[in-house]
Structure formats: structure tokens, C-alpha cells
């Protein structure tokens, strides 16, 4: 974690970060918080802590000249470096993996210059990759290549974008697995008393994403108004081969920021959890990890429950107890299927799950909405006068 402090300037808080660059030289970076000094100290301190945790020290720029002789593989690396400061750390980690492990090795081996790159070269690359990965992965490769070449056009290295002329693979239709109400009850029972209890409970009932469950803090729970606010996430990224924990006061999209009702059974369990954490903190004393104070999903000594722990231990929990294998994310699908089965309109499910638009919800869960099809069939029977027939 880099060093940093708050600085007041023109009645606003600024974050000042101090770090050593790739050459070992001490650097200082100022960032505006947009928070006025008056009554915003705690918010500013929280932002400071987040930036200190997530700040990535800029690496030395690659010694690659942007000219007519640049290889396409080298240009992709240069673009990756340029785009690093404009995107979230988790997005950069995803880009880096695709560019450095897949795209660059393929094109470097072929020695194709940027100015000589043709649509057929890209099409050959996609065809080759489809032999080993699914179409959705190739679509992601295409998206990165297209963005990089768009940048090349912008800075006048090439006149047109060859990726515009490529046929993108058709996206795979995905249907998530889901548990029935009985299976959910069985799962919550076997998870009780384990580190997965709270993640399983909240993901099943509220349909929360893994990042949203692990990002829940006590200040997002209002026990008086009985509300639960989804506004913070915890994710993990692999940067330069190292696993980095990312904590951020934001969710996937604006619609992901939502407030949900805190129902009595969940409220009671969270109050119990709060009491347990207070007890553990007193018993452990100085041994308790105070870095993650305020988070719901921590263990007995205060260590945060990491995303990879949930993904690795969840299938083991199912297998150990003889439950049908599903992914942790499928608890979100299970929540949606139960809502649909109980007559909740798709629009309300969209808002409950925090999808950015209605089409996202409809595309994912329309195959589950059989009840509405029966209703439509019945309406047609009655409309066409088929007597007492029923669908």
C-alpha cells in the first residue's frame, strides 16, 4: 500500500499519494476528491484509504517507437500501457491477460507489422482461437484488438481499422443453473457456521453478485429503517502475476447501486453476526486484523473473505454434502427463478438484481418465465372461443 495523506486546498480535500517509480525516484500524485472540507472528513479518509490500497505504481514505458516499422504485437503492448490509466484495475487485469498471454504471442510469432495488418490476419487469429476457447472469449479478444486499432487510427498510424471488416463470432447462449426452494433451504442449512454462511444467505435471498456480498459493510445496513444498501464491492485482479484485492465504493453499473429491504430473518442473523464480530475483536485484542473493520464478511480474526476463497470452497461445500453442483453466481439465477415462479414481474426483478436495463434481465431469464407463456396461451384459448379448454 502506498503512502498518502489528505490535503486541504480551496476548501476542498485532495488526496496526495507518495510512491517510488520504476527508477526508484520519489513521486507525488495529487487527486481531487470533489469533497468540501466541511462535514466530509470521514468520507475523504475512506476515499484516501481506497486509493492507497488500489493505486498502481506506473511502470516504465516500453521502449517501443510508434512508427511505420512497429510490429502489431508491440503496438498492442504499447496500447495496453496507454490505456492503463484510463480504466479500472480489474478491467486492466483482464486486458493484460488477454493481450500478453494470447494476442501478443500469436502475432509476434508471425512478425506482422501494424501497417500491414489485414482483416484476414485477424480472421485467421479468431478461427485459430476458436479451436481452443469458446466464442465468448474470442469476442473479448476482438473487442481489445478493435479498441487498440481504433487508437492507432486516432493517432494516424493507420488510415482505417481492419477489425471493422472482420466477422465477429456469434455469442454463446448461456443458461445458468439454479436451485429450487428446497435446495436453497438445504444449502443454507449446511453452510451455517462456516465462512460461506453469510455469502450464501445473501446471494440466495437478494441475488447479490459475489463482489457485492463481500463488499457489504455495516454502514450499509440500517437496522432502524430495515434497509440494506448495495454500494461497495470487493473483487480480485491478477496484475503482473500477483493477486490484488480491490475494494471500491462503486458497483458494476449505476443501477447496481440499490437499496433493498432488510427482512426479519436476515436482520436477526446479521445482528447476531455483528455481536459475534464484536466478541472476536475483544478476545483477539491486538491480534485482530483491523484493516477490514466494517466489513460483514470477515473471519474470526478479522481477515476479509476473499473472492477466490468463495469460488474455491463453494463447490467443495456442495460436493461434501451431496448437493447438486452449481456455481456461486448461480445463486443469483436461483433468486431470479424463485421470484419469477412466485409471479414477480420481470421489471421488478431487474431492479432487485441491479441490472442496467430490462433487456439484460429478459435475455437471461426469459427461458424461466414459463408461467407467463401459460397465461398467454390461456388468453388465446379464451379469445378464440375454445370453450372450457385450458392451457
In which residue ranges do the predicted regions lie?
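Basic, Lys/Arg- and aromatic-enriched nucleic-acid-binding interface segment
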Residues: 139, 154, 158-160, 164-218, ...
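DNA/chromatin major-groove-contacting recognition/catalytic segments
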Residues: 186, 190-192, 239-246, 342, ...
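Short N-terminal "domain-start" leader segments
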Residues: 1-10
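N-terminal DNA-binding module of tyrosine recombinases/phage integrases
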Residues: 9-12, 19-120, 275-292, 391
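N-terminal core-binding DNA-recognition domain of tyrosine site-specific recombinases/integrases
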Residues: 39-40, 80-157, 173, 304-309, ...
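Short functional hotspots where side chains directly engage DNA or cofactors
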Residues: 113, 164-165, 225-231, 327, ...
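C-terminal secondary-structure termini that scaffold catalytic or DNA-interacting sites
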Residues: 225, 236-257, 264-266, 272, ...
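Short, basic (Lys/Arg/His-rich) helix/loop patches that form interaction surfaces
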Residues: 189, 193-196, 206, 260, ...
